């Protein structure tokens, strides 16, 4: 029952955040934003009361669902796509390093650890909104219109390679940095459930932070190229 209620709250947050972009009435915009924020808080509180890891991870897409339409409207009307890409990359780095080094310091803290986990996962969701909301509208400005379909296909091709490859790499890094856990699991000293909470996830998280660093470098390069060649990445899509 609680899970169904949380799903309903998620739909309310998504709907109100999306509708926020398509109304010009200030009072209605404020009401929609308030409903979205209150729904998000209630969702997090219900997850905290359940004290389960999946409820924390379930928050990950929730803020992304809420703010992606808003960020898309910002890019359309204000521009700054390359800057948003860089900012999203910085948030990716900070969040993964927080999970790797700061969150373990609060192990055993029922309030502090859960609070940091929720805040970090929400910010991580926001970073996942910043990157696509700025990346996709920028593609037509970077490639010839005749090959724009191929450009999008190439992006998704590379993305799917990453979705296939990096879970394998993370698993390999996890095994190589936790040989004792792997041996205990192989010798049936511990169960897979016990192994999952015994692994040290520091290095896989550092690896993901490095990917954020690579994205930040690419963002800096794009902003530099845009400044030199005038591609219009920082300009709004809607010209007055």
Protein language model annotation of sequence segments:
Residues 2-3, 172-212:
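A membrane-interface helix-boundary motif in multi-pass transporters
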Residues 61-69, 160, 164:
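Residue-level signature of mid-helix packing/kink "hotspots" within the transmembrane helices
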Residues 136-142, 171:
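Intracellular helix-loop hinge segments at the cytoplasmic ends of transmembrane helices
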């Amino acid at each position: 029952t609680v899970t169904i209620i949380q799903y309903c709250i998620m739909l309310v947050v998504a709907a109100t955040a999306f509708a926020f972009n398509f109304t010009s009435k200030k009072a209605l915009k404020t009401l929609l934003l308030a409903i979205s924020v209150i729904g998000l808080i209630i969702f997090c509180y219900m997850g905290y009361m359940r004290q389960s890891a999946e409820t924390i991870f379930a928050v990950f897409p929730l803020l992304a669902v809420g703010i992606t339409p808003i960020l898309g409207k910002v890019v359309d009307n204000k521009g700054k796509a390359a800057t948003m890409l860089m900012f999203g990359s910085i948030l990716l780095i900070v969040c993964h390093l927080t999970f790797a080094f700061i969150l373990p310091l609060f192990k055993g803290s029922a309030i502090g650890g859960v609070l940091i986990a929720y805040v970090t996962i929400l910010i991580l969701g926001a970073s996942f909104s910043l990157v696509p909301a700025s990346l996709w509208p920028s593609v037509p400005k970077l490639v010839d219109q005749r090959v724009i379909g191929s450009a999008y296909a190439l992006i998704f091709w590379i993305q799917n390679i990453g979705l296939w490859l990096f879970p394998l790499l993370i698993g390999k890094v996890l095994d190589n940095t936790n040989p004792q856990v792997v041996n205990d699991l192989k010798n049936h000293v511990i169960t897979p459930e016990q192994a999952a909470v015994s692994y040290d996830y520091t290095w896989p998280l550092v690896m993901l932070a490095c990917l954020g660093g690579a994205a930040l470098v690419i963002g800096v390069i794009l902003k530099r190229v845009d400044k030199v060649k005038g591609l219009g990445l920082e300009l709004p899509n809607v010209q007055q």
